[in-house]
């Protein structure tokens, strides 16, 4: 992908950013109706940094996360992932970059029900072109690190809610991405299990230097991240610790 990388000189902050958004805008259109979500939004996430995005329901938090992950296309502006300008990539190239550079964890685990925990976690490695033995080795290592080494042959229906979400975290991290994007990753769990999964994500962040960008309604969890950004009326602003 080097041939499509920007030729422009980057600032030190830009060069070390795992994800960067510049003048990002998104407007949904239906017939003659236009619904702007945000306009002129800037964001930079450094290697190993943890960022929480908070805001009211309907503020556009999930939309922003989808744009950062290349799952949606901005109306204008640019998103850079691992130094690559997403708008310059084909659909196939974007998919490959997502698989290699990003991990995704959602409120609902989205594990494939017909496959075991091991097979679910192996999937991103296989999609990156590595052979089965390598994929199995990486998946087993991650499942062990999230406390599921004894559950690798169980299907999602045989796992508890917390175990399914831990499996989803392992799947997100198995390719050692630069950044994990989480959309309410603990929102469907009870408080105790949510705390366990959140601690796990922070431990893996420290161990692998993987950046985290988490959309959450839980201000208590948000306060434990490096930065808290509030999306309100299309604007993104950093909150002081006392305001979170």
From Swiss-Prot:
Domain of life: Bacteria
EC primary class: translocase
GO cellular component term, pick one: plasma membrane
This protein's record includes keyword Translocase: yes
Membrane topology: Peripheral membrane protein
Quaternary structure (record): The complex is composed of two ATP-binding proteins (LolD) and two transmembrane proteins (LolC and LolE).
Molecular function via GO: ATP binding; ATP hydrolysis activity; transmembrane transporter activity
A single GO BP: protein localization to outer membrane
Identification of the protein by name: Lipoprotein-releasing system ATP-binding protein LolD
Function recorded in the entry: Part of the ABC transporter complex LolCDE involved in the translocation of mature outer membrane-directed lipoproteins, from the inner membrane to the periplasmic chaperone, LolA. Responsible for the formation of the LolA-lipoprotein complex in an ATP-dependent manner.
């Amino acid at each position: 992908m080097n041939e499509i990388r920007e030729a422009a000189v980057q600032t030190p902050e830009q060069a070390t950013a795992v994800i960067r958004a510049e003048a990002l805008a998104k407007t949904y259109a239906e017939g003659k109706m236009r619904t702007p979500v945000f306009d002129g939004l800037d964001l930079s996430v450094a290697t190993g940094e943890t960022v929480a995005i908070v805001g009211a329901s309907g503020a556009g938090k999930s939309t922003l996360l989808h744009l950062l992950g290349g799952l949606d296309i901005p109306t204008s502006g640019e998103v850079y992932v691992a130094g690559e300008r997403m708008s310059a990539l084909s659909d196939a190239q974007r998919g490959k970059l997502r698989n290699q550079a990003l991990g995704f964890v959602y409120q609902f685990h989205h594990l494939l029900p017909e496959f075991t925990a091991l097979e679910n976690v192996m999937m991103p490695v296989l999609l990156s072109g590595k052979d089965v033995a390598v994929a199995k080795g990486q998946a087993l290592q991650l499942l062990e690190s999230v406390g599921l080494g004894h559950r690798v042959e169980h299907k999602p229906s045989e796992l508890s809610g917390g175990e399914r979400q831990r499996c989803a975290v392992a799947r997100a991290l198995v390719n050692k991405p630069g950044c994990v994007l989480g959309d309410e990753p603990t929102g469907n769990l009870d408080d105790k299990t949510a705390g366990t999964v959140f601690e796990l994500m922070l431990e893996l962040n420290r161990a692998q230097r993987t950046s985290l960008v988490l959309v959450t309604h839980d201000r208590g969890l948000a306060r434990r991240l490096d930065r808290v950004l509030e999306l309100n009326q299309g604007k993104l602003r950093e909150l002081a610790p006392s305001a979170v």
